[in-house]
């Protein structure tokens, strides 16, 4: 139960941070391109790599800190960072084909799922 509360608290913090960063980017770059989403995905991916290495290998942080920061805060900030970390882990462990398949499947199937959801709702309305 403690971990669930930590994930929830971290997720709330990460979601608010994502919203604020999105607004900040929108004010600076305008609405013509999704700069906020790109910025969040790239910075979230950097942070998950940095924190995973720092927390797990340099700091020896508690499972609670890992759950709060990585699953909670960064999970609320961007799930693209988790996808990126999983893909890199597969590639670093020599599972090149699995890693590439995971990347292609994640992006391709997610795009198809969004398209299917849009099409279904448009057909219902």
Curated annotation (Swiss-Prot):
GO biological process: cellular detoxification of fluoride
Description of activity control: Na(+) is not transported, but it plays an essential structural role and its presence is essential for fluoride channel function.
Keywords from the UniProt entry: Cell inner membrane, Cell membrane, Ion channel, Ion transport, Membrane, Metal-binding, Sodium, Transmembrane, Transmembrane helix, Transport
Keyword match Transmembrane helix: yes
Catalytic activity as recorded in UniProt: fluoride(in) = fluoride(out)
InterPro entries: FluC
Ligand binding (Na(+)): 75, 78
Residues passing through the membrane, by range: 4-24, 32-52, 68-88, 100-120
Keyword match Transmembrane helix: yes
Membrane-protein topology: Multi-pass membrane protein
Molecular function (Gene Ontology), one example: metal ion binding
An annotated GO cellular component: plasma membrane
Location in or out of the cell: Cell inner membrane
Family label: Belongs to the fluoride channel Fluc/FEX (TC 1.A.43) family.
NCBIfam families per record: crcB, PRK14195.1
Function: Fluoride-specific ion channel. Important for reducing fluoride concentration in the cell, thus reducing its toxicity.
Protein name, UniProt field: Fluoride-specific ion channel FluC
Organism: Rhizobium meliloti (strain 1021) (Ensifer meliloti)
């Amino acid at each position: 139960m403690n971990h669930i509360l930590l994930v929830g608290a971290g997720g709330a913090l990460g979601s608010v941070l994502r919203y604020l960063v999105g607004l900040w980017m929108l004010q600076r770059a305008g609405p013509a391109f999704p700069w906020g989403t790109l910025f969040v995905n790239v910075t979230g991916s950097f942070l998950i790599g940095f924190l995973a290495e720092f927390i797990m290998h340099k700091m020896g942080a508690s499972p609670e800190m890992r759950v709060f920061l990585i699953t909670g805060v960064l999970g609320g900030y961007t799930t693209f960072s988790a996808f990126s970390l999983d893909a890199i882990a597969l590639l670093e462990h020599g599972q090149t084909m699995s890693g590439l398949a995971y990347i292609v499947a994640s992006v391709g199937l997610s795009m198809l799922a969004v398209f299917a959801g849009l099409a279904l709702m448009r057909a219902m309305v």
